[in-house]
Amino acid sequence: VRTGRSRRGRNGGYQQQSSSPHANAPGQTPGGGAHPHPPHNNSHNNQHSQGPGPTRPPEPLLVPGFDPATAPLIKPWEELTSIDPQPRLTMEYPGCPDSCRLIDLFCPIGRGQRALIVSPPKAGKTTLLKDIARAITHNSPECMVIGLLIDERPEEVTDFRRTFASFGNDASGNPKAVVMASSNDHGVERHIAVSMQCIAICRRMVEAGRHVVVVMDSLTRLGRTFNLSRRYASSGRTLSGGLDAKALEVPRQIFGSARNTEEAGSLTIIASCLIDTGSIGDQVIFEEFKGSGNMELVLDRKIAERRLFPAINLSASGTRKEHLLIPEADLKTVTALRRRLMQMPPHVQIEQLLAALRRFPTNGHLVGSAQ
């Protein structure tokens, strides 16, 4: 593991320099201030940037709070032992949005979770991702939150940056959350470089014992990006929807990096995935990642059209091994509540839950009243 200070190159990108005991967070300048653009390299360095691909030689990376003197004691990423996601990352806090309380009840998220937010267009996924990021910075200050935006609209990138900046700084004066983004006015190589550098930085932070949460929007656009690359979509075989047979190999490795480790830290990835876009390729991308996640939260367009938010489809949403994240007594009550709700239409389920959230100030009161 090597770390380094960064300097601005003539092309506006960041180039890595020699080791330094004081490394900066992703998107920060050596002075400590957040830079408005994520770190990226020029086209030559893109060919050698560290990422999930097995053939890329390592480059010095910026790891917040890492002392290079401890590098010989750190266990490499490939040798870390993966374990089940836990403990739970609690979303509920005083005055939190309803979405946070419903996630805690029906789709709990733990450290190391590989979570999919499955959503049709205009169902509220972006708002949900920002609510989750705010809740994590509020309740879990030990976690570093990174927003990874690929091929997003420039105004969405600005909105994310301002929202994340409003979360404030931690006790050390570093931002609680940063954004690494490549908007849709940039090219494919820029998208790939940003996503691969982000996940490489996260891996080094986990090796150093940090807990990292990546909020990604979206896996669908990431898959599209790699499908447009001559380097990564090079098998010569085309699947349904125009996807190259090798196009999703690296995106699978990126999403699969999320894990809790026994010897070091954890990497949690909460990524949105688009469905019902009218594109066969987008559906293929969703099916490819569906089996890789261990938590799935599905948003319903019909519920959103009734202006009911969060528009969660409870019957299709859930977390694997949720018994590790929810106390046994609460789990029995939540299971009974879920069974009762399954007898109602999806929009009625949300109406009933929102009414219950208004009656009870906390989830503890709600679950206790149902026991």
Question: Across the structure, where does each feature detected by a protein language model lie?
Answer:
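P-loop NTP-binding catalytic core
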Residues: 56-117, 123
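N-terminal non-cleavable signal-anchor helices
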Residues: 2, 60-64, 158
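P-loop NTPase catalytic core
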Residues: 122-124, 130-371
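Short intrinsically disordered coil segments
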Residues: 44, 75-77, 327-332
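Extended, compositionally biased low-complexity polar/Lys-Gly-rich tracts
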Residues: 48-72, 77-80, 174-191
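Arginine-glycine-rich low-complexity intrinsically disordered regions
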Residues: 1-59
